[in-house]
Amino acid sequence: MKHIIFSFCLLAAASAAYASSPKKSSVIPASKVMTHDPVLAKQGDTYYLFATGQGISVMSSKDLKNWKFEKPVFEEAPQWAVETVKGYNGHTWAPDIIFHNGLYHLFYSCSAFGKNTSAIGHATNPTLDPSSPDFKWTDHGKVIQSVPNRDMWNAIDPNIIIDENGTPWMNFGSFWDGIK
């Protein structure tokens, strides 16, 4: 009988936890948004937040106060990343996004935690609006890679700037050997 009561209590607790967790379609106040390495982009009247997460987490908001989850950039880990970065499981880090030459360019980190087995990837989309018929992320693969016992730097945490001549530049780095 004790096992039945314990099992019932455990099931009830799990159900309550599931019911109280935010659903992907629910609106979440900004004070409840928990994320790592966020970057914002605005298209039209909508802000889009990209962050570290499985497939690159994406959220949207009209007012920066109320957010909703969108589908991740990648439903599955990019094959090039799985093949290139041993230990990478689709948890993609520190995205950065710019709008340049009519496309949104998203740069992201694929890494094995605690190692400099890493690479920075690049994807583009003509729009950030998931309801647009033009919405489609195109992955362009690896931009740069770091390899243990070869490189004394780590290819993670990309940041893109565009200079006064319209030329994009990337910097990246970590505690391995600073910014490159």
Task: Cite the ranges covered by each PLM segment.
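Bacterial Sec-dependent N-terminal signal peptides
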Residues: 1-23
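Carbohydrate-active catalytic/glycan-binding domains of CAZyme proteins
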Residues: 18-180
